[in-house]
UniProtKB/Swiss-Prot annotation:
Residues 149-151 are annotated as: G5. The keyword Ribonucleoprotein does not apply. Residues 58-61 are annotated as: G3. It comes from Clostridium botulinum (strain Eklund 17B / Type B). Keywords: Cell membrane, Cytoplasm, GTP-binding, Membrane, Nucleotide-binding, Ribosome biogenesis, RNA-binding, rRNA-binding. CDD domains: Era, KH-II_Era. This is GTPase Era. HAMAP family: GTPase_Era (MF_00367). It holds the Pfam family MMR_HSR1. The keyword GTP-binding applies. Residues 120-123 are annotated as: G4.
Length: 295
């Protein structure tokens, strides 16, 4: 009997949703950064076994939106909990239950599918904090399963996957077994570049960064030639991104190239230009051009 179903991962920004998904898949398919709100789109990722197929939906964190891009992200996260077979509510033990957590849990109360509490980052906490957190969340919601994990190290992740399999109904193979994501290669490439920019810039430039793939061609010898526009909101941000004597932009390019070669499994040449598009996060037309469709 073949089993298949859809699992969505929800939680506040920066609790480790993308890290968990990347560990399960063994591929960097979702952007990972130490900054919150780095995932901006729902990404369907497919895990296929001999007798099962799990389609994961990795979502943006749910937060109070401050601009049209934020509205898009929150609506994407809410929409992803409809018509799924299982919801994983991800959080970590070192933070109190906040308004964001309660907002998410309240939105899940009318769901017919089971909801798991997945307590991430237990390796960074203490047994006392973990126990207190489990008690707090259990008093807020009737979770079917509670699974403490350390996604970055893979601790208890296999146990979580085994539990997920038990929730799958009998069903078809929705995607070919060699397909691991429903997003095009260009999208993953843009997310890799955006992640590296966020990591290199740290707190120097806020989340007003987008990536537009201008060209992506593969030559006869297999080498990819990629040209990218890195879009920011202010002229001052452009200067920071380029850096003194172009050193910051060079660093972003080098770290991006390394990760792109791992993902594409071939040599990559990448060129990055920095462009200013003022208030692009509130520009509906530009958001659409960059792939953020209005919900």
């Amino acid at each position: 009997m073949f089993k298949s179903g859809f699992v969505t991962i929800v939680g506040r920004p920066n609790v480790g949703k993308s890290t968990l998904l990347n560990y399960i898949m063994g591929e960097k398919l979702s952007i990972v950064s130490n900054k919150p709100q780095t995932t901006r789109n729902n990404i369907q990722t497919i895990l296929t076994g001999e007798d099962y197929q799990i389609v994961f939906v990795d979502t943006p964190g749910i937060h109070k939106p401050k601009h049209k891009l934020g509205e898009y992200m929150v609506n994407s996260a809410k929409d992803s909990t409809n018509d799924v077979d299982l919801v994983l509510f991800l959080t970590n033990p070192d933070e109190e239950i906040g308004k964001g957590d309660k907002f998410i849990l309240e939105s899940l109360k009318d769901k017919k599918c089971p909801v798991y509490l997945v307590l991430n980052k237990i390796d960074e906490s203490t047994p006392e904090r973990v126990a207190k957190s489990l008690e707090m969340y259990s008093s807020e919601f009737n979770f079917k399963e509670i699974v403490p994990i350390a996604a970055i190290k893979g601790k208890n992740v296999d146990t979580l996957v085994d539990l997920m399999k038990t929730e799958l109904p009998e069903g078809p193979k929705y995607y070919p077994e060699d397909m691991i994501t429903d997003v095009p290669e260009r999208f993953v490439v843009s997310e890799i570049v955006r992640e590296k920019a966020l990591r290199c810039l740290r707190d120097e430039v806020p989340h007003g960064i987008a990536v537009d793939i201008i060209q992506m061609k593969q030559s006869d010898n297999g080498t990819y030639h990629i040209e990218v526009d890195l879009i920011c909101e202010k002229d001052s941000h452009k200067g920071i991104i380029i850096g003194k004597n172009g050193q910051m932009l060079k660093k972003i390019g080098e770290t991006s190239r390394y990760e792109l070669e791992r993902f594409l499994r071939t040599k990559v040449n990448v060129k990055i230009w920095v462009k200013v598009r003022k208030e692009w996060r509130d520009n509906q037309n530009l958001l659409k051009e960059l792939g953020y469709k209005k919900k």
